[in-house]
Amino acid sequence: MTRKPRRRQGAREVNNKFCVLLCLYIWFKSVIPDGRDLNRMFPGSKTGSLASQVAFKLMSKIVPQVDLIIDYHTGGADRFNAPQIRIVKDEPVLDELANTFGAPFVLYSKNINKSFRNACYKIGVPILLFEGGKSFSFDKTVTNTGVNGAKRILHYLEMLNSKFKVSKPKKQPVYVSNSKWIRAKYSGMFKTTVSINTFIKKGDIIGNITDPFGKFNHFVKAEYSGYVFSVNDAPIVYKGDAIMHVSIELED
């Protein structure tokens, strides 16, 4: 069970602090120089590999001291993600925090074994996983969503200085309880024809796959109706590659 973050009582509270960790930025990826993915090494080991020791330090020195964690991620492997918060189902505390953050989508997903999110969940520390944009790419909308969401959370916890304005979300988040990837049926050059965040209907043409010589042109049709919240931006795809993530079940 996730514990509820403590609200601070006024600006006189000494421990009104938030911590920003950019420990992975120097490597530009979550794979540590020893070749291991840090996000698959939690809770870590004091005497293990470098990645395992980094995970152990986070879990033993920092995480036990905090009331709430917001973990910011971008899409990998040329995938562009719509701004979204990922949490587990049936956790009212996380639902309230995700709604306060105000990202366009809230995706219910299971915790992955040995991930940072799973390790925090096991010890009751609330964590919001933010996904948005893609690696090595700047997107103003995604950045603003992430910043504004953090400000709303700080305001909710009564930790934000009154000189900072807090904007309301333009609309309520769409809660996604189940989703599926549409996969490429052929290899070739892929170009999408739909925008992220849009609602598509089963049978809609959402892109096409061609060859370099113009002799082959396959129109990709939506296999499900739902919101598009992740798109593969890679110019070349192979048969079976995930090209578009679509919601198939929504929560009221």
Residue ranges and their predicted role:
Residues 1-252:
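Structured catalytic-domain cores with a bias toward divalent-metal coordination
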